[in-house]
A protein has these predicted regions:
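Conserved AMP-binding A3 loop
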Residues: 33-35, 153-177
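Structural core segment of the AMP-binding/adenylate-forming
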Residues: 50-51, 78-136, 142-145, 258, ...
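AMP-binding/adenylate-forming catalytic core of the ANL superfamily
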Residues: 90-93, 107, 235, 243, ...
Length: 483
C-alpha cells in the first residue's frame, strides 16, 4: 500500500476522520473512540507546548502500558518532540543514565507501578501520567510543529556488549512504512481488538502495537503487567482478536482449561526466542488462531524478516521468514547477519564511533547475530555473535550483567550465558570465581543481591562457582566451554 503520510502525528491525527466513533482504546473503565482519543492527544500536545517543549526536544516516558502512555507519547510527537521510551524494569540508576544521556526535557512516569517510585536525574521535570497534566493544554493544531518525514521520531535505547545502553534513532517516514508492511503480513484489520502485553517501551509494543493499530483502526487494549488469568478474562470479555506475545504466552494459553474463553482469537505473532515445531503445531490444533506470524528484527533496524501467510509449521518455528520489502539481508563470511535498507536506524545518539562500528561504509548494519538462509530463502538465526540471550522476550546482555556482578565484593570474575528454560525460553546462568580474601557468598545470596540492583530479566537464575574461567590466548572468556 502506498501511504501518503510523512509523519506519525499526521497519520495518528487522521485516525479521527478515518475511524471516527469506532472504539480506539479500552483501559479498565476508560473507553475512547478514535475521535475522542485524537482530541486528548491534541490537548496533550498543547500541554507539552505550553510546558516549553519544542520541535526536536526529547521527552522520556518511563511507565507501564496504559491509555495515558498512548496519549502522552503521541501528544509529545504531535508537539514535534522526540519520544524516548524507558524500560519499566530498569532500576532508578539504570533509568537515570538513559534519561540523562538522552537530554530529555521532561520525564513522564506512573508513580507506584511495581512498587517503585520513579525519579529522574536532577533538573529534569517529572510529570505523573495519572495527574491532570495531559488534559491541561489547549488543543494543538495540526502541522504547527513543522515536522517532516526525515525528522527523528523516537530514540529507543538498546544495550551493546559493552553493557552501556545506546540510543537508536528512527525517523517518522521509515517507521510508518515499516509497520504498514508489518500490519499487512500480521493480518491486522480495521475493527480488530488488539490485547497489548508487549511493553510500549519496546519497539514491538510501540510500533507493531500502537503505530500499527492507528494505521489499521484496531482497538488498543493496554496490559500493564502480564497475568495469564487476567489475559484470559480480557480475551473473553473484550472479544480479543489479535494477541501477539513471546512463546511463553502461547504456552500459557495452551494450559488454559476452558479453551472456549479464547474463541475470538484470530491472529497471533511471536518471535524473540526459539520455538519448537510442536508448539506451533499445538497452537494451530488446540487454539483458535488462524494465523501465526514470526519474524526477526532489532531496535537498530525494526523488521528485517517476517514469515508469510501459508508458511508451514516448520518454517514458522525454525525460521524468521523472508526479508521485508526493500530490505537487503546477507550473511557475512563469519556468519553474521548484515542488514541494509530504509529501515536501518539514523545512527546512535551522540555516539558516532558506535554508529561507525555498527554500520559500515556500504550501509550494512552489522547485527551481531549469526544466521543462515534456508534453500527457500528464509532466514534462520543460529546464534548470537555478541552472546545476547532472550528472557521471556527481553534482551539480556551478558557483559552488562557481568559488570553488575563484579560490583559484589566477593566476586573476582564472572561470566554469564543463557541456558534453556521451559517457560521463558532462556535465563541467565553466572559462572563466578570468588575473591580469595573476601568472605564467602552463596548462590542464593548473590542472586538476591542481584535482584536489588538490576531488572528482573537480567538476574541470573543459576550461579555456579568455579576455580577459574576458561580463557583464550588473548584473555577472553571462551563461553562455548561453559555451555
Amino acid at each position: 500500500m502506498t501511504q501518503s503520510w510523512q509523519t506519525i502525528p499526521e497519520m495518528v491525527l487522521s485516525a479521527a476522520d478515518r475511524f471516527g466513533d469506532a472504539e480506539a482504546v479500552v483501559d479498565g473503565p476508560l473507553r475512547l473512540s478514535f475521535t475522542e482519543l485524537v482530541t486528548r492527544i491534541r490537548c496533550a500536545a498543547g500541554a507539552f507546548a505550553e510546558h516549553g517543549i519544542q520541535k526536536g526536544d526529547r521527552v522520556a516516558v518511563w511507565a507501564p502500558n496504559s491509555a495515558e502512555w498512548i496519549i502522552a507519547a503521541f501528544g509529545l510527537l504531535t508537539a514535534g518532540a522526540v519520544l524516548v521510551p524507558v524500560n519499566t524494569r530498569f532500576k532508578t540508576e539504570e533509568a537515570a543514565d538513559v534519561i540523562g544521556r538522552s537530554g530529555a526535557k521532561a520525564v513522564l512516569v506512573q508513580q507506584g507501578f511495581l512498587g517503585q517510585d520513579y525519579a529522574a536525574p536532577a533538573g529534569v521535570p517529572v510529570i505523573d501520567l495519572k495527574s491532570d497534566f495531559l488534559s491541561s493544554g489547549s488543543p494543538f493544531k495540526q502541522d504547527v510543529s513543522g515536522l517532516t518525514g526525515t525528522d527523528i521520531s523516537d530514540i529507543i535505547f538498546t544495550s551493546g556488549t559493552t553493557g552501556r545502553p545506546k540510543g537508536a534513532r528512527m525517523n517518522h517516514r521509515q517507521t510508518l512504512r515499516m509497520y504498514e508492511e508489518w500490519a499487512t503480513l500480521a493480518d491486522l484489520r480495521e475493527g480488530d481488538r488488539y490485547l497489548m502485553i508487549n511493553p510500549y517501551f519496546h519497539t514491538f509494543g510501540l510500533k507493531a502495537g500502537l503505530i500499527a493499530s492507528f494505521l489499521r483502526g484496531a482497538t488498543m487494549l493496554p496490559v500493564a503487567a502480564f497475568d495469564i488469568v487476567r489475559v484470559v478474562e480480557l480475551v473473553e470479555a473484550e472479544r480479543i482478536t489479535m494477541l501477539p506475545g513471546p512463546p511463553t504466552l502461547y504456552h500459557s494459553l495452551l494450559a488454559v482449561p476452558d479453551k472456549g474463553k479464547l474463541a475470538t482469537l484470530r491472529a497471533g505473532v511471536t518471535g524473540a526466542a526459539d520455538i519448537p515445531v510442536e508448539l506451533v503445531r499445538r497452537i494451530h490444533d488446540e487454539l483458535p488462531f488462524q494465523t501465526l506470524m514470526t519474524g526477526y528484527g532489532l531496535t537498530e533496524a525494526g523488521n528485517v524478516t517476517l514469515s508469510r501467510p501459508g508458511d508451514s509449521f516448520e518454517d514458522v518455528a525454525t525460521t524468521a521468514g523472508l526479508p521485508c520489502e526493500d530490505i537487503d539481508v546477507r550473511i557475512a563470511d563469519d556468519g553474521e547477519v548484515l542488514v541494509r535498507g530504509y529501515g536501518v536506524m539514523q545512527g546512535y545518539l551522540d555516539d558516532p564511533a558506535a554508529t561507525a562500528e555498527a554500520i559500515d561504509g556500504e550501509g550494512w548494519l552489522h547485527t551481531g547475530d549469526l544466521g543462515a538462509f534456508t534453500p527457500s530463502g528464509r532466514l534462520r538465526i543460529v546464534g548470537r555473535k555478541k552472546d545476547m540471550f532472550i528472557v521471556g522476550g527481553f534482551n539480556a546482555y551478558p557483559a552488562e550483567i557481568e559488570g553488575f556482578l563484579l560490583e559484589h565484593p566477593a566476586v573476582a570474575q564472572a561470566a554469564v550465558i543463557g541456558v534453556p528454560d521451559a517457560r521463558l525460553g532462556q535465563v541467565g546462568k553466572a559462572f563466578v570465581v570468588v575473591n580469595a580474601g573476601k568472605s564467602a557468598v552463596t548462590s542464593d545470596e548473590l542472586i538476591a543481591w542481584s535482584r536489588d540492583r538490576m531488572a528482573g530479566f537480567k538476574v541470573p537464575r543459576f550461579v555456579e562457582f568455579i576455580d577459574a574461567l576458561p580463557l583464550n590466548a588473548t584473555g577472553k572468556v571462551m563461553k562455548d566451554r561453559l555451555r
